[in-house]
Amino acid sequence: MKDKKLSRVAFDFYYASYDKLIEKEELGWTGWDNKCWKGTFLGDIKRLLKCELNQKNLVNIANYCMFLWNFEEEAKDGH
């Protein structure tokens, strides 16, 4: 029973994350290779950590952390 519930939560999280990425693209997001987003992501994470931690905010934090992680990986690769 726990495995099914965990699987469902992971599935819901995946789709919520995907929907957030699509929403950002529609608002002009050009991809995580655009360095101008780095400061915005850091600010958004700090702002969201002060808010109620609901599902939407956790998805947003996870997405912003993913973008920041990608910046670090690209820097290691010399991009």
Where are these regions (language model features)?
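Flexible "arm" and connector segments at domain edges
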Residues: M1-H79
